[in-house]
């Protein structure tokens, strides 16, 4: 799926990008300091307010409607979207030196994409290939010791950091096979719109799983912006360090907990 030349090419690009990040990141040079600076707080808060308004008029209503779909449709959609995420997770497993996870995720992708009908079903789970944690280029940078840089809130996309934003750019410059197939090589069968539709689907799927959690956080937070910032940074730190600490939001395997 990813030959050695591709992996080495991506690794070289990441090393070069790390050097650029060191120039871009405005963060503490003291290794012991863990606090991430909110360098652009005024802009971030304005963007956060915009995102919340957009959520109330668009994403929350769509997610609420999505929750009313029959559970097999929700499970199938979530499985298919999770299967696509392996195309980013696998190269990052390799870059992080986690070849066991790379092998499991590769096997899961092949089995679920074929026997599982483009990932709608998860026969790999029945074969003992358990779902692994997702990885991305932001997490890979973190394992390489790159600091988060300033906290960011991106329009529509939500919480991020300089490190994670650069990681996303890596995905769109050759590090995401799904992006390459659909956007860069728009064909008769797989088009650019398929990529953006899948990303929208991931957002709606995540939002639908967290309707109650988000409502509770907003209701009980003195400063909802600060709460979301804290949860995001904690979650990213947990994922980078492969910790088992759970946050208040749900992942791809949590539909059972939402069933009445």
Question: Which sequence ranges carry the predicted segments?
Answer:
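A structured, mid-to-C-terminal "fold-capping" secondary-structure block
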Residues: 32-35, 144-260
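Bacterial N-terminal signal peptides that target proteins for export
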Residues: 4-16
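Bacterial N-terminal signal peptides
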Residues: 15-25
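N-terminal targeting signals for Sec/Tat export/insertion, comprising classic cleavable signal peptides
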Residues: 37-64
């Amino acid at each position: 799926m990813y030959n050695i030349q591709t992996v080495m090419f991506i690794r070289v690009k990441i090393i070069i990008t790390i050097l650029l990040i060191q120039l871009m990141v405005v963060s503490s040079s003291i290794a012991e300091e863990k606090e991430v600076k909110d360098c652009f707080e005024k802009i971030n808060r304005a963007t956060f307010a915009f995102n919340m308004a957009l959520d109330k008029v668009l994403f929350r209503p769509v997610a609420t409607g999505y929750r009313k779909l029959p559970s097999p449709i929700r499970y199938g959609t979530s499985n298919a979207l999770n299967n696509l995420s392996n195309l980013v997770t696998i190269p990052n497993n390799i870059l992080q030196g986690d070849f066991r996870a790379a092998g499991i995720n590769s096997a899961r992708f092949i089995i679920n994409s074929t026997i599982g009908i483009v990932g709608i079903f998860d026969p790999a789970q029945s074969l003992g290939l358990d779902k692994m944690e997702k990885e991305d280029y932001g997490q890979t940078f973190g394992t390489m010791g790159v600091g988060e840089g300033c906290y960011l809130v991106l329009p529509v996309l939500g919480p991020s950091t300089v490190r994670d934003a650069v990681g996303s750019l890596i995905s769109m410059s050759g590090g995401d096979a799904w992006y390459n197939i659909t956007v860069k090589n728009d064909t008769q069968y797989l088009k650019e719109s398929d990529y953006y539709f899948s990303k929208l689907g991931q957002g709606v799927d995540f939002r639908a799983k967290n309707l109650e959690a988000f409502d509770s956080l907003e209701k009980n937070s003195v400063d909802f912006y600060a709460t979301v910032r804290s949860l995001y940074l904690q979650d990213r730190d947990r994922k980078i360090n492969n910790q088992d600490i759970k946050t208040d939001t749900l992942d791809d395997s949590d539909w059972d907990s939402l069933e009445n």
